[in-house]
């Protein structure tokens, strides 16, 4: 099932036109700029549970990460079904060359500077992975019991789902929108 939660009647109509379920208009208190995602998902779960259906898990697709290749969602569902984890998060690989700033103004490398590998030598274990907000799959009980999309509590399990680097855009600034638009145009023109 594809369910859209929105407070906008026009967006609801568009979602329905493309085959999504829009069983309710999201309440105003869950549609503010400061509203977290988890209460919105919990609202939808509660709606469906009260109406006789409780999903085993929820796949969250956020509009700010619109680039997904054909087959990605089916591959994600398959991996989640096979792995037995409580939650799964979409990630893209990034090199290990990450730096942080300390309060004293000094930078610190999150890698061994004197043993810096070439990018071509990196392995699955030496890459870092960036959560990009594109896709999460979470067992329903994690939302309802822990109010989180990831099972980071003691005993909870999380899996990583590798997205193609082209799927890694997260729209936070105007330039990100341009990048996403370009990537989607490219994907559609190539027929991927």
Model-derived features with residue positions:
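A short acidic, often aromatic-flanked loop/helix-cap motif at beta-alpha or helix-coil junctions
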Residues: 29-33, 96-97, 166-169
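Short phosphate-binding loop-to-helix
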Residues: 3, 9-59, 67-71, 75
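Conserved core of the sugar-phosphate nucleotidyltransferase
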Residues: 37-39, 43, 57, 65-154, ...
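Short active-site oxyanion
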Residues: 1-3, 166-167
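Catalytic donor-sugar/metal-binding loop of nucleotide-sugar-dependent glycosyltransferases
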Residues: 148-169, 174-178, 183-189
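Short beta-strand scaffold positions
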Residues: 4-6, 137, 171
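A generic structural signal for short hydrophobic patches within well-formed alpha-helices
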Residues: 12, 142-144, 177
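Short internal beta-strands
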Residues: 2-6, 90-91
């Amino acid at each position: 099932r594809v369910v859209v939660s929105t407070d906008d009647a026009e967006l609801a109509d568009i979602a329905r036109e493309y085959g999504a379920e829009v069983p309710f208009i999201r309440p105003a208190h869950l549609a503010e700029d400061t509203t977290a995602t988890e209460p919105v998902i919990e609202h939808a779960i509660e709606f469906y549970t009260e109406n006789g259906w409780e999903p085993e898990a929820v796949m969250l697709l956020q509009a700010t990460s619109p680039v997904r290749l054909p087959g990605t969602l089916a591959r994600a569902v398959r991996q989640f079904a096979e792995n037995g984890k409580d939650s799964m998060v979409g990630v893209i690989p990034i090199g290990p060359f990450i730096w942080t700033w300390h309060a004293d103004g000094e930078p610190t490398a999150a890698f061994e500077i004197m043993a810096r590998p070439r990018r071509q030598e990196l392995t699955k274990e030496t890459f870092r992975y960036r959560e990009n907000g594109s896709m999460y799959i979470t067992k329903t009980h994690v939302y309802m019991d822990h109010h989180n999309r990831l099972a980071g509590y003691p005993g909870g399990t999380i899996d990583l789902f590798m997205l193609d680097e082209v799927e890694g855009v997260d729209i936070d600034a105007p330039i990100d929108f341009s990048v996403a638009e370009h990537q989607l145009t490219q994907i559609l023109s190539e027929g991927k």
